[in-house]
């Protein structure tokens, strides 16, 4: 039996897309910028290669502070030197990032990836017994965590004897706010129990500023990350993704859309990095496309609206409840949405009626973007590369 006509049309469209992707010497893009093919590169190699054509630009942002690509790379290299010289980390080792969505997690991911270290992303609000289980099962060589969330884990990490890298909100605070932030953090840390083996993120960077160490290259088949997902039934599952898996997301998504103004066009990251949706699409994809990423440690609909109005936001990915809250938050519906070109949602279904209402709002504000659905927060990374207006 022949397939229905609409299926034949979609197959033809898929053929055109495939041929387009592999045309022009395997470079995706149009205009002034192109996305390089993934080759055998690891994630950090791919980031460097994909973004070198853009020069220096604002790569990441923490609230009001923007960080240039050159500074971002310098932080990555300095932290890689810390991991190599202080902890002796090497290819195949595992290191745990136990942080909310922040700039330090991105720096840590690329620094560890440079060395060939597998990054185990763990939900930062899990109870300390679960943290112990993940650290022990992966034989993790250390843990990066946020000072504000560290109190309940001091005994566990001291018992395990693993070195701790402590992040603070002040690490990337704007100059006028840094002193006040450090004062408040100092008060809290004074009353918190103490880690036996601890280095602060800022001191690690300062100690190894401008230091460079050799890394691993062309190891695309190596495992890059462990993502500790919840699964649907039974015990939680650990997803292992290779460098190639992670790099294919920005490579394929670049066909759907590419950056027009490096460092000016931005994406607010409202998803965690312990899911591929947050790490690969919201984080790695936006960074490799020279978008300015604005990580938020917790979802705040009013703050998202504020950032939308102050920045040129071109992409947003999230879960259904986030988009529902945004839809009902005063000020989200407005002309600032006209800059948006991509929106993806995963983790659960949205009702057809809500999708219609939300997409009507987007159309009303002059954007061709539509809210596109995926599946789980990890599985959504595959359909996001093909689920377009076609």
Predicted segment positions?
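Gly/Ser/Thr-rich phosphate-binding loop
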Residues: 314-317, 327-390
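Conserved adenylate-forming
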Residues: 86-90, 208-221, 226-269, 291
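Short hydrophobic alpha-helices that are characteristic scaffold elements of the AMP-binding
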Residues: 110-115, 137, 275, 285-288
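Conserved AMP-binding/adenylation subdomain of ANL enzymes
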Residues: 247-266, 274-315, 329-330
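ATP-dependent adenylate-forming carboxylate-activation enzymes
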Residues: 99, 117-135, 147-150, 291-311, ...
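Structural core segment of the AMP-binding/adenylate-forming
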Residues: 6-7, 114-203
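Conserved AMP-binding/adenylate-forming
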Residues: 39, 65, 80-129, 270
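N-lobe entry segment of adenylate-forming
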Residues: 1-86, 91, 171-196, 212-217
């Amino acid at each position: 039996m022949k397939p229905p006509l609409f299926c034949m049309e979609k197959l033809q469209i898929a053929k055109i897309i495939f041929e387009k992707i592999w045309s022009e010497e395997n470079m995706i893009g149009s205009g002034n910028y192109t996305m390089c093919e993934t080759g055998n590169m690891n994630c950090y190699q791919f980031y460097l290669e994909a973004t070198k054509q853009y020069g220096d630009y604002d790569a990441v942002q923490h609230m009001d502070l923007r960080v240039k690509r050159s500074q971002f790379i310098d932080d990555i290299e300095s932290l890689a030197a810390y991991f190599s010289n202080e902890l002796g980390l090497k290819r195949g080792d595992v290191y745990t990032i136990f942080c909310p969505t922040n700039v330090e997690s991105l720096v840590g991911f690329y620094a560890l990836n440079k060395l060939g270290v597998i990054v185990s992303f763990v939900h930062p609000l899990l109870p300390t017994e679960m943290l112990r289980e993940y650290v022990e099962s992966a034989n993790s060589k250390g843990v990066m965590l946020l000072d504000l969330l560290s109190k309940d884990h001091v005994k566990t990490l001291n018992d395990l004897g693993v070195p701790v890298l402590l992040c603070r909100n002040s690490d990337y605070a704007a100059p006028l706010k840094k002193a006040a932030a450090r004062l408040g953090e100092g008060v809290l840390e004074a009353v918190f129990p103490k880690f036996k083996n601890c280095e602060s993120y800022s001191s690690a960077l300062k100690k190894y500023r401008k230091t460079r160490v050799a890394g691993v290259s062309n190891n695309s088949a190596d495992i890059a990350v462990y993502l500790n997902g919840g699964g649907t039934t039974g015990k939680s599952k650990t997803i292992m993704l290779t460098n190639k898996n992670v790099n294919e997301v920005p490579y394929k998504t670049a066909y759907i859309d590419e950056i027009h103004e490096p460092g000016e066009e931005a994406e607010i990251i409202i998803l965690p990095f312990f899911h591929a949706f947050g790490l690969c699409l919201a984080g790695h994809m936006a960074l490799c496309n020279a978008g300015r990423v604005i990580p938020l440690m917790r979802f705040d609909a009013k703050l998202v609206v504020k950032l939308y109005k102050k920045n040129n936001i071109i992409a947003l990915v999230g879960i259904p409840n986030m988009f529902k809250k945004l839809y009902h938050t005063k000020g989200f519906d407005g002309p600032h949405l006209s800059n948006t070109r991509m929106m993806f949602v995963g983790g659960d279904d949205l009702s057809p009626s809500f999708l219609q209402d939300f997409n009507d709002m987007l159309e009303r504000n002059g954007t061709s973007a539509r809210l596109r659905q995926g599946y789980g927060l990890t599985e959504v990374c595959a359909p996001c590369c093909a689920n377009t207006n076609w």
